[in-house]
Structure formats: structure tokens, C-alpha cells
Amino acid sequence: MSEQTIRLTQYSHGAGCGCKISPKVLETILHSEQAKFVDPNLLVGNETRDDAAVYDLGNGTSVISTTDFFMPIVDNPFDFGRIAATNAISDIFAMGGKPIMAIAILGWPINTLAPEIAREVIEGGRFACQQAGIALAGGHSIDAPEPIFGLAVTGIVPTERVKRNSTAQPGCKLFLTKPLGIGVLTTAEKKSLLKPEHIGLATEVMCQMNLAGAAFANIDGVKAMTDVTGFGLLGHLSEVCQGAGVQAQIVYQEIPKLPGVEEYIAQGAVPGGTQRNFASYGHLMGEMPVEWRDLLCDPQTSGGLLLAVTPESETEVKATAAEFGITLTAIGELVTARGGRPMIEIR
């Protein structure tokens, strides 16, 4: 089988960040009765489900460490590698950091798919690393029943500039740097529903590097930041709210959306991860139309940054985003938690 005709998505049961283990199941897996080793220099661990771990070196600089990998979300091997690498590197930017090095993680069905195809995947990953200004310095591979690719990435950040997902404040406005609907469009393509004018749109968005995160770190008014990936906007927003003890009010019409996404939802192009996300986070949300839920719980692969910004810093954040070709519009705001109200209200 040639590299030109291969359809990688046929060789995996999941796709991109949509193949994440559901939050409810993950909570069971991570639960431990053992006493946890406490290291005072570990600034960010997994307590708030943040994007990466952060370790204070004690000299004003902290190290950021993350890993991310998944099964193919697109058929083209080079694009798969590029998307997976971009997605992994994003975790460093989401913490406000600068990536400095990456190593590859590769699982490959060597008796089913030619090694030349795996090489194309690696080349796509290397291309993304070059875009981020880092080397793909090595890696590890195994013979696996399904193709898997991703990176372990190391970054650095001034300790005082670390951006967490748990430090938002009431009054902050919410911004999203990429449109939603990646899971919907990739599902529509698998179902042969995708219109010609929408082919390649999801890949283009997934390949956009979240470089702006390192610049947002220099703005004091950016009180919290995370990237929106497999748990969807509402899943990752709920982590922001839970970490800070606040509630969110979202205006659906202000949320950036990929072209055609609502039409494809109406045609049933909803990935399986959407329902898993709703099953995990639905109890935290107010009433909304099903079609809104299907977009807001849509698992994103290499999605955008979600920012919580003080009103005083809104102009500076928008100007910084514009330097990276990003136009920002507030999609909602955070408010003081009130009893008897859902954590996230959509209107």
C-alpha cells in the first residue's frame, strides 16, 4: 500500500484528543490511597488537571514538563505527525512557557503499515517542532496494534509568569483563540458529509501553533489560561471554574465556530467523545439546546487557548493576540459563585 493511498484513520478506533479516557473513568484510575510524596518545588501537579507539570528550580526559572499522544485524526501521515506535535507543544504555551526540547512517542503496527509511512509521521512532528523553534531530540517507539504518535515536551518559564488553569477571578472576561468544531468537521469527513469548501479547514486550525501563550504570560491581567482539547470547551472551562471557585456565564453566539459546524451537527456528525464529555460534565451546566451541547462538548484536537482576563487588560490582550493574527471577542465572563446556580450558564 502506498503512502499516497493510505488512510490512517482506518487503522485506529479513536481519533486525536477524542480518544482520551473520559474524565469520570480517569478519576477512578488516578485515585490513590497511598500517601502522596510532597515536593515543595513542584508548583503544578495533577491536582487541578492543569496542562503540564511545573517545577521551580529556585533561581527564578521553572521547568515545564508535559506529554501528549494519540491515534490518527487525519489520513495524511505528515499532517498527523504535525497535528500531534502541535497539540503536545501547546501545553507548554498554555502554561505561559517557552518550549526548549521534545522527544517523540511512536506506536506503530509494523506488520500492517510500512515504516516509510511512520517516517512521514515523524517528519510532520519534526516540522512542527521547527515551527516552535525546538529540536526533536530523540524518542521511543514500540510495535503497537494501532498507530500512535505524540511528544514529551520540556519548556521553561519565569516562575512569576506561570499561568495556571485554577487562578481565575470573578469579573474576568473569557476569550478563546481558535474556533470550535474540530471534532465535528473531522467526523463529517469520515461520514462523507464534508462539503468541498470545508475540506482541510480542521487540519489548518489544528496545525496553528499556540505561540501567543508565551506572550500572554507577560500580561498580569491574564489571570488563568488553559488550552481546549479533548474534554471540549465546557469540560476545560469547568476545570477553570472548579479551580477558582467561580461560575461562568457564556454567550453562545459569541463563541467562534468553524464554518458549517452547526449544519454538520444537525446531520449527525457528532463524535463519540462528545457524549462522554457531557456524561462527565453535564451536571455542572445549565439548560441548553442539544445542538449547543454537541458543539460545546465537542472534543478539540490541538484547540485554542482559553483565557480569563481582567477587564483592565482586555485591550492589551487583544493587541497581543492581533500580533499573532488572532482576533479576540469575549465569549463570556466569570462571576462570584452563587448557591443553587449551575457552574456554567449558557445563553
From Swiss-Prot:
SUPFAM superfamilies in the cross-refs: PurM C-terminal domain-like, PurM N-terminal domain-like
Family: Belongs to the selenophosphate synthase 1 family. Class I subfamily.
Binding site for ATP: K20, T48, R49, D50, D68, D91, G139, H140, S141
The protein's assembly and partners: Homodimer.
Function in brief: Synthesizes selenophosphate from selenide and ATP.
Keyword Secreted assigned: no
Catalytic activity as recorded in UniProt: hydrogenselenide + ATP + H2O = selenophosphate + AMP + phosphate + 2 H(+)
Keyword annotations of the record: ATP-binding, Kinase, Magnesium, Metal-binding, Nucleotide-binding, Selenium, Transferase
A biological process term (GO) from this entry: selenocysteine biosynthetic process
Binding annotation for Mg(2+): D51, D91, D227
A GO MF term: magnesium ion binding
GO cellular component: cytoplasm
Gene from which the chain derives: selD
Protein name: Selenide, water dikinase
Cofactor(s) recorded in Swiss-Prot or TrEMBL: Mg(2+)
Entry keyword Repeat: no
Lineage top rank: taxon: Bacteria
Chain positions of site Important for catalytic activity: K20
